[in-house]
Amino acid sequence: MDIRKFFGVIPSGKKLVSETVKKNEKTKSDEETLKAKKGIKEIKVNSSRKEDDFKQKQPSKKKRIIYDSDSESEETLQVKNAKKPPEKLPVSSKPGKISRQDPVTYISETDEEDDFMCKKAASKSKENGRSTNSHLGTSNMKKNEENTKTKNKPLSPIKLTPTSVLDYFGTGSVQRSNKKMVASKRKELSQNTDESGLNDEAIAKQLQLDEDAELERQLHEDEEFARTLAMLDEEPKTKKARKDTEAGETFSSVQANLSKAEKHKYPHKVKTAQVSDERKSYSPRKQSKYESSKESQQHSKSSADKIGEVSSPKASSKLAIMKRKEESSYKEIEPVASKRKENAIKLKGETKTPKKTKSSPAKKESVSPEDSEKKRTNYQAYRSYLNREGPKALGSKEIPKGAENCLEGLIFVITGVLESIERDEAKSLIERYGGKVTGNVSKKTNYLVMGRDSGQSKSDKAAALGTKIIDEDGLLNLIRTMPGKKSKYEIAVETEMKKESKLERTPQKNVQGKRKISPSKKESESKKSRPTSKRDSLAKTIKKETDVFWKSLDFKEQVAEETSGDSKARNLADDSSENKVENLLWVDKYKPTSLKTIIGQQGDQSCANKLLRWLRNWQKSSSEDKKHAAKFGKFSGKDDGSSFKAALLSGPPGVGKTTTASLVCQELGYSYVELNASDTRSKSSLKAIVAESLNNTSIKGFYSNGAASSVSTKHALIMDEVDGMAGNEDRGGIQELIGLIKHTKIPIICMCNDRNHPKIRSLVHYCFDLRFQRPRVEQIKGAMMSIAFKEGLKIPPPAMNEIILGANQDIRQVLHNLSMWCARSKALTYDQAKADSHRAKKDIKMGPFDVARKVFAAGEETAHMSLVDKSDLFFHDYSIAPLFVQENYIHVKPVAAGGDMKKHLMLLSRAADSICDGDLVDSQIRSKQNWSLLPAQAIYASVLPGELMRGYMTQFPTFPSWLGKHSSTGKHDRIVQDLALHMSLRTYSSKRTVNMDYLSLLRDALVQPLTSQGVDGVQDVVALMDTYYLMKEDFENIMEISSWGGKPSPFSKLDPKVKAAFTRAYNKEAHLTPYSLQAIKASRHSTSPSLDSEYNEELNEDDSQSDEKDQDAIETDAMIKKKTKSSKPSKPEKDKEPRKGKGKSSKK
């Protein structure tokens, strides 16, 4: 290939680019791009008229300009051409508005391959040191002459000049496109003047350009300019900068905001920035060069951004240094700037934009190699935590005995492995003396107990917060030296008891001094407490009766009898009340008497207060919203439950649901009927009981004076333990309850433990949902300590803490345990309370997923579990627990393997063998009903696999897939049996043969006509089905069974129109089948075996004859459908009926 042809393509390509840009076409046609990439002959055809005119003026230089050569004559011609453009440059710089009409733009804006080749060729030629001989220079000189004739701006021919490698990677200044053009022009002139003998005019021009370049370099070495360029690079990458651009902010506004922020943060640098701006604006040389290109620069931001990316190595390194300085200076000045912002409110709006740009580097730094390395180290630390050893010198140090409550009020955090004590022992030791152990370090933490292989994050946080760090010996020394304290709970109870004793003393004095109470006090007392008001009313009525009765007696006798009678009655009442109180259980003795005394329900948004507000507004809301359905109240914006006619209190047992409901009704004056699990709550009984309760009145109201005013007409129904409404006795109870709620005229309060129970899900939509949570340990502890103080029990607070945790924060269970354990002795130690609470730990119902997780769990959760405890996990549900173990044991990473794959596989093999042995035991239990083997199955199916694979599960426990596969196996077996029966007259084969040989062929034969012919093949398929006596259900079953590996059936891929046509065609016709479509009735009575054989034969003959008659009868034929008689009588029957009546009446 001739190299001249290779270089001849480039200038013509450039000419084409200039022509298309001059026409202001946004998109180029495919023909022009193809022609630009083809040979020289096509390019000559596309040459413009200006080029032809120029060639006519210079006929001697035609071919030499197009093709490169190394001859000396061509060099001299190029030198002469190089001198022409500088002479004509000042002439073309006069017009200022031509810049808008100038079609020539910067080369980097176009995405054409020709321009890229031009740049590449230019850079290569300059590297070889032959830039003066290149054709690019000559072609550009030629274009400069054309531009002078058309009077274009001076920068337009320079924009099309070739750019060298030095312009991109050399010492050139970082600036927009016009700066590069200056640098390239300077180099071109310098090379040409060296060869032409250094003309005086060229030297002068070159000196001026050198001065301009030096000035540019000095201006652009400013730190403020480098920072602005860095911000320009960062802005489009950050999200916040995009919001600014969407809002319409220009680069100038960002730069202005930056300058304002810089005035506050960098006052010593503002002057240099101002000087540089003045130099840029007032230098005459820059004004002359950039006046014509100001408007074009505003419209070419995209090209300027591209050019800004191409910078020299020195400038890029300088930018990196500037960024580092900037970050360090921001870190130092940020606190000072924050203080200034508080003082100067006016400047807040100005400093917002720089903050947005400064936040972006922090986001970039988050995804860095340092972060990935940090994650790797954290993962390695976690792996080492899982495989770390226990205490090496267990029990080597003597544990001291400290004073009582010596650590009360102190909070500890334990990290690492303690050498002589296990973590649980250290925790119980701290709690024994009143301390508290938490999991994470916070400001409230007093001591961090650090051991071997401690957590780095906890130690760093403790050092940052100034928390004291001690070791194991420091903890023991702390217990040994700290003085004892009196418990804060005991102090609170003592003060409370003192207040109560003072209040009790003062009313007694008043009663003794003034026996008669004023009516105002009567009213206040009746408002405060209803029981006391009732007692007072009873006493008053008795006094009135006695006054009337003793009118005739003397005053002295009357007084003596009254005092003696009062003292006797008082003594009898006191004795009886004391006996009753002593005989009461603690749960009834200390049961709350008001809403304020319910533990954990003191807040304004507590469930008790919500229920009180709901019941108070029930009459108003029910009268207003009669037409609205209750279920739509779920979507109302209010949280007061005003649209619901019933409330549902759900929560764990022993948290005060029933107590709250009864106290709320008492406070608002509602009489209530309570139905719990001991009552029959079926559909019929609910109707009767609720209907009766609506018309009831309480007898208590008739004892008082104002019987009519005190009797309440407000009733409520309390349904306790709604989730227990099951079985035959309560059949239909939930549905009847929902019906009652829809049409009730009294409030209904329901209670349950398990809100997610299937029966409760339908009830939830009609009730105001109130979920009770377990009270905190501190809340329960305070109330229990006061009760213990009243009963004279001496229990340390840590012991009470263990009792509460052992009862799973069930207040009722805590009171029962206290009354039982303190029946013998009135003192209870910490160790005794912990042992008793562990023995009497409340059984918590666990689901199968929790059981599966706990079987394989490692660590503190299962460290102290005995063999019996591990086998008890199996007995939570012995029918499904083995399936959960078999499904999830492969998802466990065992600790015993230690990351070794071979050990892991060995453990998996041994666990699988144990599960197989458990399955053998299960088959013996189920087949021979040998239920005594269940403990052996627990060992094989649960305990052994759990011990071998004890570790950490990689995912949540999955449900056993065996259950779904087993049900589908039974279903498929029934389907194949039905198909074998239906096709038996055609195939004469067994169920296995049909499954193995017939089904796959039948599937293809039934689907093939529909896929190939479409709607036309429907009749063929229906005929084939009739041939084999197949129904529509059999067709679907064949498609389902014959598809393997979860692949979709071929029938599902058909066009819906074809499927619809097939269904219509099959349903249109009647299909005869040799088998009954309905269930055949069972045979009639069979004779007893005690009869004689002859008699049996006779009976059989009679039966056979009768059976033949029955078979012949149309009515008994199962293949013939009977017509159902219409319920409406026919016309003649209607006519006959009155005639019969008339006849009877006439006869009478």
Swiss-Prot record:
Residue stretches of biased makeup (Acidic residues): 1094-1105
Phosphotyrosine, modified sites: Y67
Phosphothreonine modifications at: T110, T161, T163
The organism of origin for this protein: Homo sapiens (Human)
Its biological purpose: Subunit of the replication factor C (RFC) complex which acts during elongation of primed DNA templates by DNA polymerases delta and epsilon, and is necessary for ATP-dependent loading of proliferating cell nuclear antigen (PCNA) onto primed DNA. This subunit binds to the primer-template junction. Binds the PO-B transcription element as well as other GA rich DNA sequences. Can bind single- or double-stranded DNA.
Subcellular locations according to the entry: Nucleus
Pfam families named in the record: AAA, AAA_lid_RFC1, BRCT, RFC1
Gene symbol of the encoding locus: RFC1
Family matches, as InterPro entries: AAA+_ATPase, ATPase_AAA_core, BRCT_dom, BRCT_dom_sf, DNA_pol3_clamp-load_cplx_C, DNA_replication_fac_RFC1_C, P-loop_NTPase, RFC1
UniProt protein name: Replication factor C subunit 1
